[in-house]
């Protein structure tokens, strides 16, 4: 491959990290950004991660909301290939079986640290969006025969739709781990903290961000970790 292709929301952290990785490896990078949030000012598409995408040398294109962005990425990859490039497509959030293996490793590291330090927890709580984090954690814990529940606080989709998406990726991930006894009821999703939609913080999100900043010196974001912390609280 000589070109990385990926997609995400306008201010996608994953897209920015992909652009940086491409720069390090001497690869070209083509990013598709979805306008998920209505009524944003023009600066929203020129600043922050979009600016950093371009600083890293990525080609950036925008798409309107409510289209299949992974299908769009595949189509762009095909077009680049027809023009002589050798593209490698990475789904949004890096959420495929290969990407989920990163959070399989995370699950293993967590359990190792729990054992070494004799720590016990009732559950893991995190923000669930493009599904890679939750699928990787659930698959990794299953590989370790751990019964520790993983609760995903949805930042975008309703519960059943998110469970379907996570379960699809779990099945693809455990296949790589040669596991075949995982059950769908391991996928736990709470959709009570989405509010008005993706990247639109609720009052609870803002309160959680304020609380952590003032009591722990930890900065959360209004898209993912702020909603997850609101769910934990």
Task: Label every PLM stretch briefly.
Residues 1-233:
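PLP-dependent amino-acid enzyme catalytic core
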């Amino acid at each position: 491959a000589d070109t990385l292709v990926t997609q995400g929301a306008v201010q996608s952290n994953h897209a920015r990290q992909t652009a940086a990785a491409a720069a390090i490896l001497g690869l070209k990078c083509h990013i598709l950004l979805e306008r998920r949030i209505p009524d944003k000012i023009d600066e929203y598409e020129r600043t922050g991660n979009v600016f950093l995408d371009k600083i890293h040398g990525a080609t950036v294109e925008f798409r309107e909301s409510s289209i299949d962005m992974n299908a769009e990425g595949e189509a762009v990859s095909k077009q680049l290939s027809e023009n002589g490039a050798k593209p490698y497509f990475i789904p949004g959030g890096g959420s495929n079986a290969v990407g989920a293996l990163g959070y399989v490793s995370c699950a293993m590291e967590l359990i190792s640290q729990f054992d070494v330090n004799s720590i016990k927890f009732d559950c893991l709580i995190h923000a669930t969006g493009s599904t890679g984090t939750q699928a990787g954690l659930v698959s990794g814990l299953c590989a370790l025969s751990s019964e520790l529940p993983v609760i995903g606080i949805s930042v975008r989709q309703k519960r059943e739709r998110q469970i379907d998406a996570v379960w699809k990726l779990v099945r693809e991930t455990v296949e790589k781990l040669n596991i075949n006894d995982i059950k769908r009821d391991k996928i736990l999703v709470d959709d009570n903290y989405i509010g008005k939609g993706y990247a639109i913080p609720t009052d609870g999100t803002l309160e959680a961000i304020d609380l952590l900043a003032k009591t722990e010196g930890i900065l959360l974001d209004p898209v993912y970790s702020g909603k997850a912390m609101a769910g934990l609280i």
